[in-house]
């Protein structure tokens, strides 16, 4: 907080891939805000849908037997889009979705007569929000520090199937509730999975009877070229968390896609297990209207598949930066997500280098995000190769100034 005191960049308006600050300067939004503005800024279709919903019903509780027609419609739509037979639990964002999935996993095993299955496994570099369970699952050490004792979790190396199997065996499968995995690690540095990794992980979970949770908060709704991102690996998770791109950030909404077999215990006759959990604003009517309109745009405008169509162009455009001695690696190639990692020598000798690159790019009218050991790029799905070129040029100039 102190680091940005009196130094805020005030973003005043947006249109497509562009945003403007309060001084009128235009910037290329090369991060889709915070990984979420998939359809681009200023879409009138979403604004109109939300306005119409506000005129009819702004919101009403979804607790107990209450529901709104628009929430029903969204849940039905999401269930139809899911890669497995499923039910939908709506939340207000990604962090709530992670907490919800974690609680469902633990409550599911309790309902199955296995209450000791509470341990959760995640990966180094993984990001799962900053709520209670998400903080405990964090594979980014800085996100866990300073908060005292947390929920018991185990982090394993992000690229090792052997480490996952060993962690389950070491803890005892009878104690492990679920493994949480981003299809592509996002905030931890943009690490696409090794070939066969996701498929192998699902097999390990099946053999061990452990639930597999795909955290698709960043990867969904076109970012990897499909509705939930994980479909491109040909697997059926036990749960999928989503948020961000489901509304393109126009209003806050998230949720969990829960496979039928995981949801089943909670749909028994009265007297069966109860999942006592739910955010106040879950299934908010106006937010649901935004999501429905956004999903329609993704399909109508051909944006859903853009993440996969553009992944090669984005990576190829940025890859020449790797020839700069100040760059260790350019990662990407799976969806419209990429990272330019700075060299260890540079970071050791110049700890402020990442911030300097971010600010130099900003001076050139390009917004990138510093994270991990470099900067990330994740533009709206309406971006083009020309926009990728602007990102490359801004980063090249920024690197030349170090």
Annotated model-derived regions:
Residues 1-402:
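Conserved N-terminal phosphate-binding loop of PLP-dependent enzymes in the Aspartate aminotransferase
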